[in-house]
């Protein structure tokens, strides 16, 4: 297994629930190092750019509106096989499904449904690279 970096974003619904500390602690307990951390609020334009891969999907506008509805926290996590492991820890996209098949996952614990699912995580090395560079400058990553 190789050491990788991946990006997570704690979404507005989880921020509103006060789940940030518990979510970050989960990744620390799983052995990840936090290499960068930033709180901000997406503008609708920047949210649209970030989620450009979904621009043709019917949920795109709703996603953009949700992601720009409140503060988020982005973090670069580093660890062995980080992309795959983080995706396993966060659970299925739909929080209702996650409660059935991965009840200890972050989305099961803090998400509501498929749209308000608490957390984003990169799904491939290519998306991790794009997303990390989109959110952070090189000087912000240790």
Swiss-Prot record:
It comes from the Bacteria. CDD domains: NDPk_I. The keyword Ribonucleoprotein does not apply. GO terms for biological process: CTP biosynthetic process; GTP biosynthetic process; purine nucleotide metabolic process; pyrimidine nucleotide metabolic process; UTP biosynthetic process. Its EC number is 2.7.4.6. Gene3D superfamilies: Nucleoside diphosphate kinase-like domain (3.30.70.141). ATP binds at residues 11, 59, 87, 93, 107, 117. It is an enzyme of class 2 (transferase). The active site is at 120 (pros-phosphohistidine intermediate). SUPFAM superfamilies: Nucleoside diphosphate kinase, NDK. Its main location: cytoplasm. It catalyses: a 2'-deoxyribonucleoside 5'-diphosphate + ATP = a 2'-deoxyribonucleoside 5'-triphosphate + ADP; a ribonucleoside 5'-diphosphate + ATP = a ribonucleoside 5'-triphosphate + ADP. Keywords: ATP-binding, Cytoplasm, Kinase, Magnesium, Metal-binding, Nucleotide metabolism, Nucleotide-binding, Phosphoprotein, Transferase. GO terms for molecular function: ATP binding; metal ion binding; nucleoside diphosphate kinase activity. GO terms for cellular component: cytoplasm. The keyword Isomerase does not apply. Its cofactor is Mg(2+). InterPro entries: NDK-like_dom, NDK-like_dom_sf, Nucleoside_diP_kinase, Nucleoside_diP_kinase_AS. Belongs to the NDK family. Major role in the synthesis of nucleoside triphosphates other than ATP. The ATP gamma phosphate is transferred to the NDP beta phosphate via a ping-pong mechanism, using a phosphorylated active-site intermediate. Homotetramer. This is Nucleoside diphosphate kinase. The gene is ndk.
